[in-house]
Amino acid sequence: MSQQLTFKQLEKAQQGDSFDWEAVKKQVKYDDNGLIPAIAQQFDSKEVLMMAWMNEAALQETLETGRVCYWSRSRQSYWRKGEESGQIQLLKDLRFDCDGDAILLLVDQTGPACHTGRKSCFYTAIHDHQAKILTNPIIDPEALYKK
């Protein structure tokens, strides 16, 4: 009988080693709600764009279609990035952290990733006990969602 693959075993793997996705997929660590945090990063600039949640079906759809799909906790439904705004994310690479409990999505983002119209959701920095806004919207959010 073969031993089940674990993320702990992957720690000992060497660069270039490959493992069957079906075996790895069984070890992904979802939270009690069946979700895993997914961080989207622009593949070429490496700018961190956003963090959202995926469930197993959203992860599978993303891998199959190449377009990023998340799970919306507030709407309790699938959220295919760009469905309403047209600002899609095309998957370039998908990586798990060492524990298998977080995902890094390297994406090609069309336009802003943030619902505020900014390229990144991470536009507020804290310095000297002050919250400083780092960027302006590149698209008016009203125009972005045609409200």
UniProtKB/Swiss-Prot annotation:
Compartments where located: Cytoplasm
Family: Belongs to the PRA-CH family.
Main location: cytoplasm
Cellular component terms (Gene Ontology): cytoplasm
UniProt-listed InterPro entries: PRA-CH, PRib_AMP_CycHydrolase_dom, PRib_AMP_CycHydrolase_sf
Natural source organism: Hydrogenovibrio crunogenus (strain DSM 25203 / XCL-2)
Pfam family, one: PRA-CH
Assembly: Homodimer.
UniProt record, GO biological process: L-histidine biosynthetic process
Catalytic activity reported: 1-(5-phospho-beta-D-ribosyl)-5'-AMP + H2O = 1-(5-phospho-beta-D-ribosyl)-5-[(5-phospho-beta-D-ribosylamino)methylideneamino]imidazole-4-carboxamide
Pathway(s) of this molecule: Amino-acid biosynthesis; L-histidine biosynthesis; L-histidine from 5-phospho-alpha-D-ribose 1-diphosphate: step 3/9
Domain of life: Bacteria
Residues where Zn(2+) binds: 98, 114, 121
Signal peptide from the UniProt entry: none
UniProt xrefs under SUPFAM superfamilies: HisI-like
EC code(s) of this entry: 3.5.4.19
Binding site for Mg(2+): 97, 99, 101
Cofactor binding note: Binds 1 Mg(2+) ion per subunit.
UniProtKB keywords: Amino-acid biosynthesis, Cytoplasm, Histidine biosynthesis, Hydrolase, Magnesium, Metal-binding, Zinc
Protein name, UniProt field: Phosphoribosyl-AMP cyclohydrolase
Function: Catalyzes the hydrolysis of the adenine ring of phosphoribosyl-AMP.
Cofactor: Mg(2+); Zn(2+)
Residue ranges of coiled coil: none
